[in-house]
């Protein structure tokens, strides 16, 4: 079916074109040609213009929609002015691509309703012609490189409701013509270079619900006119330069959920009436000059969300209701009168509590692996900084503390507490252990050293940008800025890690000389509202640091009267002797002799991972002792080991009889070395030496999900419902990364419960990429070698070798059912009688009782709504038609509750119904009737045991 059969209504994240004809549904040739030019300009050349039935819906002779997903498509062209050849165009959504150039002014003649261009490389001004688009309701240009003044003509938009211009380089004042935008509900200009004050005319925007003016360049004070915006739910103003001013009048704004007035030079007391706005979910008044006591009315906020009064001049006592709230309340940098032995000191971050701190001893150095485990780097021990994310105040055993203020807030007012991030870029570092994880903060991150010897020091702050990637896609477009304070003095304004280091994944070390006079050192990193907040995803911003090293800057004096020249001579002679000794030893052991072709091939890969010697691996595994053998991987046995620095590792050893062979081993190394995600097993390095082919992974403490759910009784873990849901979401995130976010588009091909490992905190990590296949160019191809596990394999792959990422989606659906059910997918009643969990799901669908699938071991201790959602998603994922399965990014959104499960698609999800499957379903009914009695008896015994145990206590 050709392109000329269809009409288009909008060109968007989904390109939608809707048109109504009385008797025909043919696209005029002129518009068809225009559409082809559009795709060429966007450099989107791989769209099949023959319409897939999954993408078009029609009624009789009237074609209603055609959709083409162009969001996150890594488009690298420019914006096509040829869209004017599609006169019925209503929507443009090219968000999160890599498009460059300017915005075509020609678009001003189109009847557009929505323009979404978030997250690209667009430059130049906003076309003044946009003021002619009277139909426009939404203009989203956030996270680009647009510049110039805001056009006066934008004030002529009578229907505009959403104008998001944050994270650009706009300058000048907000035009007075904007006073006419009385339909606005959402206005954002954060992270720009605007000038002037916040205009009084905003009082006319009486329908406004969201107003974001963070680090915009505008100066204070906050105008009195803001009191008229009674519909406000989300007000964020921060880093507002200008004179001191009293707290703005917000008494009549009673729907407020998020209020951020951070670093706005506010003075005076905290207003009593704020305590009467019970809709608050997030209240941040930090880094102002507010004084006085906390009003009694604020007790009404005790069951609310988050309160940050950091960095003011508040005094008096801390109310009892604010004690023991953990990271949800921060009162640091104030003047409260507190007994150092009071619980407030431990739970509310009141700095006065450190005045009477007793040092265990004095130190002449400080080394911290921020966000990571303890490790040794060139003989120097970097202390662990991996405390619980729910704590905002951490006390080490060696005289240093850290304070992490804030939670990340998205558009939905949903706060998220994240304090550690793992690497998702390609690291180009030597001491990679210091940079694979980092400490992050949403507002302010402070380290205090209280027990240093007095003297001169060099404070070295180690940074590497690990949350953006360096590829030519939207994930490389993020910009992180924060300020660096040393001893409460601003040393660096708007520090940008990637820019300083010349790229993401590179290391930059900032050194600051400091004289310590009272044994105390303070390092503070502060987010001043600058930078993107939605790239590569929402809530990515704020300070990030990998490590801290503080060393004395004074060289030790020569002893015993030895001159400096003599000392240097001895050092040179000793160094030469050591070099010859090491060279001879290595030659004797064969390390410097000619290497095999395999080793040469490995060296040519130039991978960004560690290369281990065979001797290191043998020592770590006790010469591959069978006692350290922990399993069988895709290549051969897997051993547990311990490196010299104490790091526990898992070593995958290629068996000599492996069918996959050396070539695929090297391919796996090349592939895995480019992948970094919290839900993928981390590759530390490899060894290609002496005929041995070894991969060195992080050791994952709790083995596989399969063993935890339905392995031998002694290996099973009691996984409660929140943990199961967390595991399911983690696996989905890992697959979404493989399919859509990594530089290489990868299909795993063997997703199953045994290939999902659980770490100490029961976070899931996808393992065994030995069967993975790169999905580089074609979205669909025929696999020359079927690889996977029956029962988890998608039907189109198992029967026809038809491989796409939707095969992994199918396998994920099976794993999700296992997580809910707590039993293996494959059930063998006899040698010739095998059936699968998906058959039982169909039985329960017929009975309209899907919740019967939930693991009976959970009893009633699970969230019914979440369980139903997970089952429904699994059903959609296991549809027999690949095009009916959702993408993994859609699965993540549905699991996290950010997107509703579409009932229509759920009903459309088809399942094979061959005679054999119907027989299996009948067998399933009988089987579950039988085990139902066993489970009932078992649960009764468990409940009885619990009752007896409770009675004993």
Curated annotation (Swiss-Prot):
Positions with a binding annotation for ATP: 630-638, 652
Glycosylation sites per record: 100, 132, 265, 315, 335, 378, 423
Catalytic center residues: 750
Protein kinase domain segment(s): 624-901
Gene Ontology molecular-function annotations: ATP binding; protein serine kinase activity; protein serine/threonine kinase activity
Keywords: ATP-binding, Glycoprotein, Kinase, Leucine-rich repeat, Membrane, Nucleotide-binding, Phosphoprotein, Receptor, Repeat, Serine/threonine-protein kinase, Signal, Transferase, Transmembrane, Transmembrane helix
Ranges per topology, Cytoplasmic: 588-953
Extracellular side: 23-566
Transmembrane segments: 567-587
Topology in membrane: Single-pass type I membrane protein
Annotated positions of the Phosphothreonine modification: 784, 789
Family, similarity comment: Belongs to the protein kinase superfamily. Ser/Thr protein kinase family.
Protein name: Probable LRR receptor-like serine/threonine-protein kinase At1g53420
Organism of this sequence: Arabidopsis thaliana (Mouse-ear cress)
